[in-house]
From Swiss-Prot:
Cofactors that this protein relies on: Zn(2+)
Enzyme type, top EC level: lyase
Key words, A-Z: Lyase, Membrane, Metal-binding, Mitochondrion, Mitochondrion inner membrane, Ubiquinone biosynthesis, Zinc
Family under the similarity heading: Belongs to the COQ4 family.
Additional free-text comment from the UniProt record: This protein may be expected to contain an N-terminal transit peptide but none has been predicted.
Organism, as annotated: Cryptosporidium parvum (strain Iowa II)
Superkingdom classification of source: Eukaryota
Pathway info: Cofactor biosynthesis; ubiquinone biosynthesis
Localisation: Mitochondrion inner membrane
Record field: catalytic activity: a 4-hydroxy-3-methoxy-5-(all-trans-polyprenyl)benzoate + H(+) = a 2-methoxy-6-(all-trans-polyprenyl)phenol + CO2
Name of the featured protein: Ubiquinone biosynthesis protein COQ4 homolog, mitochondrial
Pfam families attached to this UniProt entry: Coq4
Length: 305
């Protein structure tokens, strides 16, 4: 059991650094037996159900359930010139290639600049969790690429990091890449998507940021209770995330994925960093959610999101 416990290594985004993927694979790969794989899968699923925001469990489940999907995605990537270049050269979108400062140096409204703004807005790092339990170096790279594209999808679709946006994007990743955990994550995410959110329509500056656990069915933000109580009803914004996800966002992302001209995993998105994000969206034939949904999904500093 000591060996099994050691497998549940707490991941940090900073552990995926360096420019050579082979070196990263050798550094991070953990060989496990079939029995350990089953045990780790069950444990990760239980932990994931208890806390769907636990990135360690999510990463484990993805790696242990995606082998066939990764092979299909690898075949798809090899079917296009850009995809073959990606598979051959194994480029990384991480801190060994780009800093936030580098991204912010791209022109206004470029994909790279908007990506940097997204990371800055939510205080995110560019590095992603390393792949540990995929025993094929080639497939481990495909999963690494999949993870590194995630925040670029947020940027391209203009989706924030609320539970409702993450559920929407997980479903997209399942439809677009076939990764099983996309469907599992979207399903689990529906259970922790709040039924109700209450916040002031105008976000005021002098607030105290507090964490609101995302599985609370009704989110009334504690740091602005007095402020909300002093507002007239017309100045309060009441949101219904769970209903919107089921009735609006899921149908929208399903249609959006079906009408895309190209698969994003077959594209050297780095080549688009200096170009306008609108050109990238037009090339893929994607667009942000409809205007009436953007109060749920818009990318902006939202202390009460």
């Amino acid at each position: 059991m000591n060996k099994f416990t050691n497998l549940l290594i707490k991941r940090t985004a900073s552990s995926l650094k360096g420019g050579d993927f082979r070196e990263l694979f050798r550094k991070n790969y953990i060989p496990i037996t079939q029995f350990e794989k089953v045990l780790l899968s069950v444990t990760s699923c239980v932990e994931g159900l208890k806390n769907p925001t636990d990135s360690n469990s999510v990463a484990c489940i993805t790696e242990l359930t995606s082998n066939r999907a990764l092979r299909r995605l690898q075949i798809l990537m090899n079917s296009t010139p850009d995809g073959r270049r990606i598979i051959k050269n194994r480029p990384l979108i991480d801190s060994s290639k780009y800093s936030i400062k580098d991204l912010m140096a791209f022109p206004d409204d470029s994909l790279g600049r908007r990506y940097g703004e997204f990371l800055t807005t939510y205080n995110l790092e560019i590095n992603r969790d390393p792949v540990r339990y995929v025993n094929s170096e080639d497939l481990a790279y495909v999963l690494t690429r999949f993870r590194q594209i995630h925040d670029i999808l947020h940027t391209a679709f203009e989706l924030n990091i609320t539970v409702e946006s993450e559920v929407t994007l997980k479903l997209f990743e399942f439809l677009h890449a076939g990764i099983p955990f996309g469907a599992i994550g979207a399903f689990m995410g529906l259970f922790i998507t709040p039924i109700l959110k209450v916040r002031p329509k105008e976000i005021f500056e002098n607030h105290n940021k507090t964490h609101v656990y995302p599985s609370k069915p009704i989110q009334i933000h504690q740091d602005c209770d007095k402020y909300l109580n002093s507002l007239e009803i017309t100045k309060k914004e009441i949101l219904y995330p769970k209903r919107i996800v089921i009735k609006e966002l899921i149908p929208w992302i399903y249609k959006a994925e079906k009408k895309m001209r190209h698969n994003i995993y077959t594209i050297m998105v780095e080549d688009w960093f200096p170009r306008p994000i609108a050109d990238f969206q037009n090339y893929l034939n994607i667009s942000p959610p409809p205007k009436q949904l953007q109060k749920y999904t818009r990318i902006k500093p939202m202390p009460f999101c």
